[in-house]
């Protein structure tokens, strides 16, 4: 695992140095920063430590593979590393076990893998995990449901409340309907039972 480091008087200066020295873009890395107080003859400095997203995803994959082997399952992995969204796709000998009811096991695996990366590399990496494209298909269903519900709300002028969803799923709904003319959305409730309301403007 390659570790990149730089320092500067400000975060911006330290980060700019790191990107230039290593010929990388901000979208390729994740970094943490530490403020170091200067002494009598030294200025304050900001220390930047960074890792490549691709290598962090590979470490997360290793962690997940060991976890899945502990369940007596075999798995293959596919890493999609894009600047806007990073996904680790899993294809196992028993996908239903890894998916769980309503995708709860996928979510648990995701939390564990993210925590592993944070604990070992001190970066908050919000990558996602999918099993046999379950999440991709569910995302499409949620977007389709949101749009169908919005059309019904426009027609009847009666607000609609969707079932409770994760924060990621609620963001999908808000995003899908952000340009839907005459409709507005907001979320209510407390986790893990927070839900989205679709209503006319």
Where are these regions (language model features)?
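RNA-contacting regions in translation and RNA-metabolism proteins
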Residues: 1-201
């Amino acid at each position: 695992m390659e570790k990149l480091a730089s320092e500067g008087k400000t975060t911006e200066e330290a980060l700019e140095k790191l990107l230039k020295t290593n010929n990388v873009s901000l979208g390729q890395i994740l970094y943490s920063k530490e403020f170091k107080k200067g002494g009598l003859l030294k200025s304050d400095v900001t220390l930047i430590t960074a890792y490549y997203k691709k290598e962090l995803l590979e470490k997360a994959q290793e962690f997940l593979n060991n976890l899945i082997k502990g369940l007596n399952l075999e798995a293959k992995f596919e890493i999609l590393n894009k600047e806007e969204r990073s996904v680790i796709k899993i294809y196992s000998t028993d996908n239903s076990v890894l998916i769980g009811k309503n995708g709860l096991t996928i979510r648990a695996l995701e939390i564990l893998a993210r925590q592993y990366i944070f604990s070992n590399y001190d970066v908050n990496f919000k990558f996602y995990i999918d099993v046999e494209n379950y999440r991709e298909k569910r995302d499409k269903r949620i977007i389709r449901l949101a749009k169908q519900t919005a059309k019904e709300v426009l027609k009847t002028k009666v607000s609609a409340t969707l079932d409770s969803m994760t924060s990621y799923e609620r963001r999908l709904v808000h995003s899908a309907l952000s340009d839907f003319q005459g409709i507005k959305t907001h979320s209510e409730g407390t986790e893990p039972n927070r839900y989205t309301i679709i209503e006319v403007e």
